[in-house]
Amino acid sequence: MADRLDPILPGSYLGILGGGQLGRMFTHAAQAMGYKVCVLDPDLNSPAGAVAEKHIQADYVDHAALKEMASICQAVSTEFENVPAQALDELEALGVYVAPTSSGVSVAQNRVAEKKFLATWKDEAGIGPAPHLVIEHDSDITHVPDDLFPGILKTARMGYDGKGQVTVHTREELSQAWEKFNRVICVLEKRMDLDFEVSALVVRGHDDQVVAYPVAENIHKSGILHTTTVPAPSISSAQEKKIVEAAKAIIRRLDYVGVLCVEFFVLKSGDIVANEIAPRPHNSGHYTQNACVTSQFEQQVRAMARIPLGSTELVQSTIMLNKIGRAHV
């Protein structure tokens, strides 16, 4: 097996857990650079599996499938944050270079862990999360401070694109919402006086090289990304610098290798709060395929292959419209 510091050369197999649209875009980027791709996804007709050199159709924690993937691939990554962390652990135990590792991904898989991480490293990152409280027992609802209302109740796991969250204005609404979520562990987050939302896309290599794309300003409709504008038109240069430095601090503190996106809220007061971490190429970064020297997907390939990261230079101002199929509206 090659040394963990050696570059992985074109012609080698790179693996991706997850066969959706992000995996498909990653596959095209890897193939354009001369790599082969193995996709593990349970869907026979997965978008990435359809274009990859090899598609292993199996559950993400299928031991035989993971062993087969490990025998083929020099490095493996994940397409989305809800791939079980144990799959990444098992692949690493089988001797495969995994980027990012489960330790970084698992923080973003659980909103409780994510909020704790962001709060713990607030001083280092310079930006922390919104005021919040973990809801795990009936007594937690009783002891919610009044100033957390109105708030947004979010399930700790499996929430994305506006799913797994609801706005609550009173303790009674909170109790009812928690019942509808089947009393799973949740986070109640104070609803902030939001001015606009931005995302910071950063990439870290195995050698601790970190590069950042220009901060993007996002508009969501029904919890789903609608448009992304780059450069972000509403932030000051001081705010952008603070956001980029926070994202760089977060990716280093997670010891994370690969592409990572941090979403931030800019409040009407001018304050900034960290909303969430996405441990993968991000929808708001799709514009990089046409507007930057190096796309976010090529950067993911470079990080996995342990080769130098590319330039994040923006070659033209961009407004991206996120169009999705009717089945997902």
Label every PLM stretch briefly.
Residues 164-262, 266-268:
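Internal nucleotide-binding/catalytic subdomain
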Residues 1-116, 120-121:
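ATP-binding N-terminal substructure of ATP-dependent carboxylate-amine bond-forming enzymes
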Residues 270-273:
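Conserved protein kinase catalytic/activation segment
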Residues 64-65, 87, 139-143, 173:
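Short acidic active-site motifs
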Residues 241-262, 268, 278-326:
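Active-site "cap" helix and flanking loop/linker of ATP-utilizing ligase/carboxylase catalytic domains
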Residues 102-165, 171:
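A conserved helix-loop-beta module that forms one wall/lid of the active-site cleft
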